Amino acid sequence: MKKSILFIITLLFATTVSAQRYYTPKIHVGGKAGTTFSQMSFSPDVKQSMLMGYMAGVSVKYTEENYFGLIAEFNIEQRGWQEDFEEVPFSYKRHLTYFQIPLLTHIYFGNDNIKGFVNLGPEIGFLIGDKITADFDYKNPLSVPNFPANRMTEQLYTDVKNKFDYGISGGIGLEYIIKKRHSIILEGRYYFGLGSIYPDKKKDTFSASRGTSILISLGYMYRFK
């Protein structure tokens, strides 16, 4: 009986030590940069096309269990939209620059050299820049010769009222481990905004003015422990 108890205690101790060794917490810190492709979800609808921008930031990743971790990022991202005038030769682009903080669940799989992963979680942001580029008088578009009739125009000149943004982010990617503590990360991510940039009450023009974007980034991470 004593031998059995001793065996069980030894087995439990060995398992605990093994588990602690197997699930040693790891902290990674790094930077990333990439390209964004954005547009707005307006209601009523506005004819538009994807607007290209940039993103850059820093990431902190914490993994405590195999296949699972958490990521926090601090990014500068360009979003916005580009009006689509179809056959009419007008151009209008509006870059909205945000300071973004995604907080993501990180699920990964693979081997010691290359890993695939899925990231998913909420994201908050604050508008820090608003730049309009147009080749016509966008503040008074109805006075512009040959400007398309029956087109929504209020979004062209209205200031952003809600500078705080929030939404959901999801992405997939690959991590290539260069050395024991160094890795390169390629990720594609989609952001779906839940907050409107313009007032959206019944009396307002737009019932929705939410941002959406696709982000493609390349990053580097260093593992501290």
Where does each model-flagged region fall?
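Residues that define the transmembrane beta-barrel architecture of outer-membrane proteins
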Residues: P25-I27, Q48-Y54, H95-F99, I114, ...
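Flexible, solvent-exposed coil segments and beta strand-coil junctions
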Residues: T35-S41, G80-E87, P145-E154, G195-D200
